[in-house]
Amino acid sequence: MDTVRWIISTAPEIFLLLAVAIGTMLGRLKIHGFAIGTTACILIVSVLIGQLGTFTFPALLRIVLFSLFVFTIGYKSGPEFFASLSVRTLAQVAMALVLGGTGLVIVLAFAFALKLDPGTASGLAAGALTQSSVIGTASGALAQLGLPKTVLEQQEANIAAGYAVTYVLGYILTLLYVPFAAPKLMGVNLKDEAKKLEVELSGGAPPKTENLSYRKFQARAYRVTAAAGRTVKAIEEDIGSRTVIERIVRQGADIEPRLDTVLEAGDDIVIAGRTAAIVAAKPIIGTEIDADEILKAIPGNVLDVLVDNRNLHGRSIRDVADRIGGDARGVFLRALTRHGREAPLSADTRVYVGDVMTLVGSTRNIERAAKQVGQIVRSGDRTDIAFLAAGIAAGLLAGLVSFKVGGIALTLGGGGGALIAGLLCGWLRSRRPTMGAMPPAAQQTLSDLGLGGFIAAIGLANGHAAWVAIQAHGLLLVGMGLVVTLVPLVVATLFAYHVLRMNPVITCGALAGAMTVDAAVTGACEIAESQTPVLGVAVPYAVGNVVLTVLGPIIVACTFVG
């Protein structure tokens, strides 16, 4: 033990990294398909390791780690958050606000009734509402109150205890509530409602201007006989299904396939579009030919395009196609991805900022259409460190600004400032794609390492006090956590279904998004046997990340007694 104590006093960072490593490995273990999650496991492991001795970490380390995490959260959510400030998505925003507001009211009610200290109340909110970032924002707010060191450490220990006890409970309850309890509360069968929604989304005739096809794309070569003397436009309209003539070869020379170009007998042409339409085009054009060289010369491509045009936010694919019009000629939509999950495709599927469209067609055509949609996702592995560092620095500076609430001087704190900076930087990146690059892999690394390191530092430094608090108030925290998790979910469900008249399938996805529990979306999709719940996730997820994070300073302000 003397050696262990020597390492603790000399190099405590070794145990911090060990806690992150062990907690991450345990968090990935699945039992009957269920995993606790890395954040909770890191905290539990660090609290247990904290029983070995007294760990001391510089405040700067925790500030930097948490700032990296919360800035990245803001960066990822920024485009969706600002785009959600729209009439078209007002219902989903309102639902997320109601859920977060209800959670805040219940936490404060418990705090006043049971005289909970700010740390315990903040930990309860962080765990029961499954939002780890509340730990950081609450800790930052407490640090600004000028508390004695021992008092501040006890408050941080209480945050850790409240979170450790209630997070797993809140996570499990959300996983069970969204796919099972919510549909029963609304009086619907989720599977049947999903089928109805799919029919509704796929209903109606395709619009004339809908050039974004959600069918399989194929290109074939024909030699013109029957189509001689007709224009490209006439042939494309005759074949239908948004088929496009991509190439014309006349006597060995390429002819630009403009809409008014007249085809001649003997021309070799390449048409692209739905497989069924192309196969049926033979009597309209002529004989299909084996022309590998002609087909190889077509610069076909499959590119992902990030939707960042706010004018398209909340609109249907049909509406998006109408707005893009002729610029989408020859471009086909193969997939729509939202938060890493593929959304069901139909003419009425809604598109949101932050979605990724997988487009198929010639490179030229895709690049033309992409200008109207957003930005092509280029493969790259470099992060704009200058942009990242400057953004976090600006956020930390903004966090120093103070204002008074009830005679208490409060600030956004480093966490709140970094969150706002991340939101603005993420939005700015969507407006100016040439600056502020942060590839998804880098975002995930910064987020995981920042939060994991911060949580480990909290658990190690306050391990003994947190363990004492858990032993003293564990059952009480469990009871409060159950209420803080379930009541906001129930209120939000009833509000969305009966007041906002939201589709029950969309409501289930929105509940998971507002609680920022991705796994609950997967559960809803499995019960519904459909991907339609994914359609409700995007906006509440972005709003929920922001709303729940700022609860930390609010709870501290309302419960602190000087």
From Swiss-Prot:
It comes from the Bacteria. InterPro entries: AAE_transporter, RCK_C, RCK_C_sf, YidE_YbjL. One of its GO terms (cellular component) is plasma membrane. The keyword ATP-binding does not apply. GO terms for biological process: potassium ion transport. Pfam families: Asp-Al_Ex (PF06826). Its main location: membrane. This is Uncharacterized transporter bll3471. Belongs to the AAE transporter (TC 2.A.81) family. It comes from Bradyrhizobium diazoefficiens (strain JCM 10833 / BCRC 13528 / IAM 13628 / NBRC 14792 / USDA 110). Gene3D superfamilies: Regulator of K+ conductance, C-terminal domain. GO terms for molecular function: monoatomic cation transmembrane transporter activity. Coiled coil: none annotated. It is a multi-pass membrane protein. NCBIfam families: YidE_YbjL_dupl. The chain crosses the membrane at residues 4-26, 33-55, 59-78, 90-112, 159-181, 385-402, 406-428, 449-471, 476-498, 505-524, 539-561. The keyword Amino-acid biosynthesis does not apply. It is found in: Cell membrane. Residues 207-287, 295-375 form the RCK C-terminal domain. Keywords: Cell membrane, Membrane, Repeat, Transmembrane, Transmembrane helix, Transport.
